[in-house]
């Protein structure tokens, strides 16, 4: 698992929706941002710096801007001295408000990027929080195929050559959608949600033994692919052998941990004659039912228990 960070320059140059413009501190554009939370200094500007989150992006909205621009020069000088005594990664003024010159001077001197945006504070915080959540989410790479089947994100896993890509290709031909083949990039967006995607280089491509590299979007159309998908089920394809035990009732609820999140796991034996794509489709529909609170295995088990208790089933038939 990796915990990536991003540079301030990434926000400035790669996210036009933020509408950022650099005013000072260009030398600090390589400053790292390592957390998705932001901070509005607010009370800190009055001199209360206890628990001041200086390691976050500092957002100056209308309130902060109105306060510092209404101070007399001597007070503003003291505010700036206290504020810039902390190590800051960047400062952003929203609503297009221009910071006072003393802020520009300090940011240039200390190599702290100072930026402004015409976007309102509320909208800006919503936008940048989403960007940081996605960019800084814990992530890992996983060998397998991620495909959307009946709206369920399924990660097909298993040893190389077991038939993951071939199974996915048949599912795509049936109208389902490919997300990633071979290497799946997985990010944890919250304590219980994992998003799978693919690198830009491999996106929309599959490798099939005997055919080589295929462009799925070109062959099956734009409706056969998508860029990312929530991972809700893992199906592990395993070569069938007599000494392996596989679940035959559905009463077991095994899971596999990915980035600290438990994902439902189904082990499917692979051998000649088995129609794996239809099994995957059925597993997807069954998973949707389970999300709605319907569990066929548990219902059947309960019904059987009731029959046994009522004597409706002969335990030792002749």
Swiss-Prot record:
Keywords recorded for this protein, A-Z: ATP-binding, Kinase, Magnesium, Metal-binding, Multifunctional enzyme, Nucleotide-binding, Serine/threonine-protein kinase, Transferase
Spans annotated as Important for the catalytic mechanism of dephosphorylation: 269-274
Residues the entry annotates as binding Mg(2+): 165, 207
Annotated binding of ATP, by residue: 158-165
Single Gene Ontology MF annotation: ATP binding
Residues of the active site: 143, 164, 182 (proton acceptor), 248
UniProt-listed Pfam families: Hpr_kinase_C, Hpr_kinase_N
Cofactor(s) it depends on: Mg(2+)
Free-text function comment from the UniProt entry: Catalyzes the ATP- as well as the pyrophosphate-dependent phosphorylation of a specific serine residue in HPr, a phosphocarrier protein of the phosphoenolpyruvate-dependent sugar phosphotransferase system (PTS). HprK/P also catalyzes the pyrophosphate-producing, inorganic phosphate-dependent dephosphorylation (phosphorolysis) of seryl-phosphorylated HPr (P-Ser-HPr).
Free-text note regarding domains: The Walker A ATP-binding motif also binds Pi and PPi.
Family: Belongs to the HPrK/P family.
Assembly information from the UniProt record: Homohexamer.
Protein name: HPr kinase/phosphorylase
Species this chain originates from: Leptospira borgpetersenii serovar Hardjo-bovis (strain JB197)
């Amino acid at each position: 698992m990796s915990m990536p960070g991003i540079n301030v320059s990434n926000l400035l140059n790669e996210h036009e929706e933020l509408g950022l413009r650099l005013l000072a501190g260009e030398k600090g554009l390589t400053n790292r941002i390592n957390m998705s939370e932001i901070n509005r200094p607010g009370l800190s500007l009055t001199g209360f710096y206890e628990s001041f989150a200086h390691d976050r992006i500092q957002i100056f909205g209308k309130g902060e801007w109105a306060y510092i621009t209404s101070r007399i020069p001597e007070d503003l000088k003291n505010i700036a001295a206290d504020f810039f005594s902390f190590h800051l990664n960047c400062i952003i003024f929203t609503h297009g408000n221009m910071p006072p010159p003393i802020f520009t001077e300090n940011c240039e001197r200390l190599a702290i990027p100072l930026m402004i945006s015409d976007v309102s504070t509320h909208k800006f915080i919503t936008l940048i929080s989403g960007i940081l959540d996605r960019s800084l989410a814990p992530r890992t790479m996983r060998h397998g195929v991620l495909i959307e089947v009946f709206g369920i994100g399924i990660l097909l896993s298993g040893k190389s050559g077991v038939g993951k890509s071939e199974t996915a290709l048949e599912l795509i031909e049936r109208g389902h959608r490919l997300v990633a083949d071979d290497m799946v990039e997985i990010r944890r967006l919250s304590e219980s949600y994992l998003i799978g995607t693919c690198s830009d280089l491999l996106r929309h491509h599959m490798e099939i033994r005997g055919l080589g590299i295929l462009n799925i979007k070109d062959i099956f159309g734009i409706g056969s692919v998508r860029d990312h998908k929530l991972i809700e089920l893992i199906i592990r394809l395993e070569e069938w052998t007599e000494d392996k035990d596989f679940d035959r009732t559905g009463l077991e609820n095994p899971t596999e941990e990915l980035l600290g999140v438990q994902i439902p796991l189904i082990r499917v034996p692979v051998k000649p004659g088995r129609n794996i794509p239809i099994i995957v489709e059925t597993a997807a529909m069954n998973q949707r039912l389970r999300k709605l609170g319907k569990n066929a295995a548990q219902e059947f088990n309960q019904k059987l228990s009731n029959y046994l208790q009522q004597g409706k089933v002969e335990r030792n038939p002749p």
